[in-house]
Amino acid sequence: MASQVGAINSVNALISRVFVQPKGDLADRLNSRVTVVILAVSSALLLSSHFIGDPITCWTPAQFNAQWVNFVNQYCFVHGTYFVPLDQQLAFEEEERTKVSIQYYQWVPYVFALQAFLFYIPRFIWKAMIAYSGYDLAAAVKYVDRFWSENRDKDDKFKTRLAAFEGRPSVYIWDGIRLARKKRSRNMALFYTLSTVWQAVNAWIQFYILTQLLDSSIYTLWGPSILGDLLQGNDWQTTGHFPRIVHCDFNRRRPASVQLDTVLCVLTLNIYYEKLFIFLWFWLVFVAVVSTVNCFKWIYYLCNKTKAQKTIKNYLSTAPIKSTISDDQFFSALGEDGLFIMDQMALNLGDIPASYLTISMRNICQDFIESEDYIDEERTPFVKSIKHT
């Protein structure tokens, strides 16, 4: 038992190292975390049911021995089945008889695994782009979060906490901005906005894949429609959706003849598929809508910098500022990427640590501005204006 717990802890530690990332906004968490976990776990459980137990059981003639029974079950599971209501006669023509074919259940675990991978791609792209920008945002968020966790209970005095932030996290963030600026960190906000656009597009694509997997000739919005059928008592025997009892045709070869046999099969997987697909239909709609709203929100923020500036001003208004530079000078020192970093700090850490970080960064801003590493051709006039104030 101890070895099993140790193995689980080791796996969790490995996952946490591989997927180090800020918490992100709601849409990001829904896409890259919650939905990925839902789809991955569903895929694993459903795939295991293909190999453990009997996903399909067919009613074979009495003269079939155990080998024939096993063959029929395996054949019908792999080849596919079709649905005909039990109160209707089977048509003689194969095309007419198999009109309502059931072909999805073999592929559902693999489709879910693919969807889980696709839902993580926007986060992967964002991590790749932020790595290209030269600034490790995840490490910065983690550093400030750890510092706040270690120091918030040591002293509850505002000035003491603020001094602690001025000594470590603020310098750390300013140094990160300085070093990244010397590389190519000019587009972090644009990169993040592009990742939210891809999240929204990807969510709708995944919703389309789900609807195509269970293409219904009766319903356009089959999620609410099938749920309505269940609430009204119209089960699979009436609608044909997720049927539990299906038909399967196979040929028995004999010398000089081929005999067609039709058997009834119990498709127990559809009991779970029905509930799971109804849940996923509504869930993916929810994720797609949230992702779309989030996408437009970040496009607006990209075009309008006042949101991040307003958040910072709100934090600065909560305490007296030691620095003599103006708000506009502070925003100019931060730059577009600095404003984005501060916005991400507020988003991931919450208002209290973000306010301490903002105020302390403002207090030591002039030291950063006057450092030789900060001065470049773009900012020399600005530095001169700071020194003359």
From Swiss-Prot:
Q: Which GO terms describe its molecular function?
A: gap junction channel activity; gap junction hemi-channel activity
Chief location category: membrane
Q: Where in the cell is it found?
A: Cell membrane; Cell junction, Gap junction
What GO cellular component entries does it have? Answer: gap junction; plasma membrane
Q: Which UniProt keywords apply?
A: Cell junction, Cell membrane, Gap junction, Ion channel, Ion transport, Membrane, Transmembrane, Transmembrane helix, Transport
> What's a single GO BP term from this record?
monoatomic ion transmembrane transport
On the tree of life, the source organism's domain of life is Eukaryota
Q: Where are the transmembrane segments?
A: 36-56, 111-131, 190-210, 276-296
Membrane topology note: Multi-pass membrane protein
Instruction: Please describe what this protein does.
Output: Structural component of the gap junctions.
Q: What family is this?
A: Belongs to the pannexin family.
How is this protein named in the record?
A: Innexin-6
